[in-house]
Amino acid sequence: MALKERIGTVVSDKMDKTVVVAVINRYPHPTYKKIVSRTTRYKAHDPENTCVLGDRVKIRETRPLSAHKRWAIEEILNKTSQAKEVKK
C-alpha cells in the first residue's frame, strides 16, 4: 500500500513537535462544473520543531501518533524568513 502525500502550508506552529498544515484541494463541482477549492487542515508531526508559520511543506501519512496526528513532515519545500520569537 502506497503512503499518501500532500503539499500544504503551515498555518499553526504553537504546539510542541506538532504543526497544522492547510492543504487546498481543487476539483470541479459534480453538477455545475465550477472549480471549487476545499481546505483541509492536518496535524503533522515535526520532531525538531523546524517548521514555522508560512512554510510550504510536504507531509506523508504515517501510523497514528496521537488522537489526531496521523501525518509527518517529510520535507520543507519553501522556508519563510520569519524567525521564531524567544519566550523569556
From Swiss-Prot:
GO terms for molecular function: rRNA binding; structural constituent of ribosome. PROSITE patterns: RIBOSOMAL_S17. The keyword Thylakoid does not apply. Part of the 30S ribosomal subunit. Belongs to the universal ribosomal protein uS17 family. NCBIfam families: PRK05610.1, uS17_bact. One of the primary rRNA binding proteins, it binds specifically to the 5'-end of 16S ribosomal RNA. PANTHER family: 40S RIBOSOMAL PROTEIN S11 FAMILY MEMBER, SMALL RIBOSOMAL SUBUNIT PROTEIN US17M. This is Small ribosomal subunit protein uS17. It comes from Prochlorococcus marinus (strain MIT 9301). The gene is rpsQ.
